[in-house]
């Protein structure tokens, strides 16, 4: 098993969310609105792990349902 730090994991999850979001043709605003937020700040900051912001499991569950992607896909390196 790889030696993965929490920071590395959070960054990879953010990159994977961004990849699948773009594949589905959604903007950060589109995804934010679908998640119930009125601003892109949650998605934009967490996709790049800005100031330590990261997606929590509830975010990932919502995103997987919106994007129709298995939640496990977000954890792949």
Predicted regions and their residues:
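A short, Lys/Arg-rich alpha-helix, primarily the initiator
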Residues: 1-23
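Conserved hydrophobic/aromatic packing and binding residues within compact polymer-binding modules
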Residues: 17, 31-32, 42-47, 74
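Helix-turn-helix DNA-binding elements, focusing on the entry/boundary residues of the two helices
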Residues: 17, 28, 57-60
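Residues within the alpha-helical elements of helix-turn-helix
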Residues: 23, 34, 66
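Short alpha-helical "recognition helix" segments of helix-turn-helix
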Residues: 30-33, 63
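Recognition helix of helix-turn-helix/homeodomain-like DNA-binding domains
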Residues: 37-53
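Short, basic-rich loop-to-helix N-cap that marks the start of a DNA-contacting helix
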Residues: 49-65
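Short C-terminal boundary/hinge segments that cap the last helix of small helical domains
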Residues: 57, 68-77
């Amino acid at each position: 098993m790889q030696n993965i730090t929490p920071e590395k994991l959070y960054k990879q999850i953010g990159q994977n969310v961004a990849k699948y979001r773009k594949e589905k043709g959604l903007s950060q605003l589109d995804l934010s609105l679908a998640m119930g937020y009125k601003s892109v700040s949650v998605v934009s900051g967490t996709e790049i792990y800005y100031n330590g912001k990261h997606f929590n499991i509830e975010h990932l569950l919502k995103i997987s349902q919106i994007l129709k992607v298995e939640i496990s896909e977000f954890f792949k390196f």
